[in-house]
């Protein structure tokens, strides 16, 4: 049987990775939906590369964007299954894992995968 602390286990991920993922997904969203508003000339080496992708591979960018979100949905659902498997039974904790994994993907899921619940000693 899981301990009360184990049943409600939740750990926020690294602020560094959450920042990197948020900025990357934000930029990707900008490129896919509003490519005409991007100041390519002000982005250094990233600007011409992004402009090339927008001009020559926009369909691939769009498909990749939706695939990335689909993967995040899959990771989130797996996080719920993993919560149950690891004895995290609190609905609130499961919701937090689901949301964190949905928005930040593998950066969140690796924390949950690494979690090992404490075993109670049998007397």
UniProtKB/Swiss-Prot annotation:
Residues with the N-acetylalanine modification: 2
UniProt-annotated location(s): Membrane
UniProt protein name: Transmembrane protein 254
GO CC annotations, alphabetized: membrane
Residues spanning the membrane: 15-35, 61-81, 95-115
PANTHER family linked: TRANSMEMBRANE PROTEIN 254
InterPro entries: TMEM254
Alphabetical list of Pfam families matching this protein: TMEM254
Membrane topology recorded in Swiss-Prot or TrEMBL: Multi-pass membrane protein
Protein keywords: Acetylation, Membrane, Transmembrane, Transmembrane helix
Organism: Homo sapiens
């Amino acid at each position: 049987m899981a301990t009360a602390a184990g049943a409600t286990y939740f750990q926020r991920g690294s602020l560094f990775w959450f920042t990197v993922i948020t900025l990357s997904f934000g930029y990707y969203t900008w490129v896919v939906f509003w490519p005409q508003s991007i100041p390519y000339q002000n982005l250094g080496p990233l600007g011409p590369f992004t402009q090339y992708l927008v001009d020559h591979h926009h369909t691939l960018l769009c498909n990749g964007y939706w695939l990335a979100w689909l993967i995040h949905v899959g990771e989130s659902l797996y996080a719920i299954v993993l919560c149950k498997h690891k004895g995290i039974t609190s609905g609130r904790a499961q919701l937090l894992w689901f949301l964190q994994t949905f928005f930040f993907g593998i950066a969140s899921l690796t924390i949950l995968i690494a979690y090992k619940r404490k075993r109670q000693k049998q007397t």
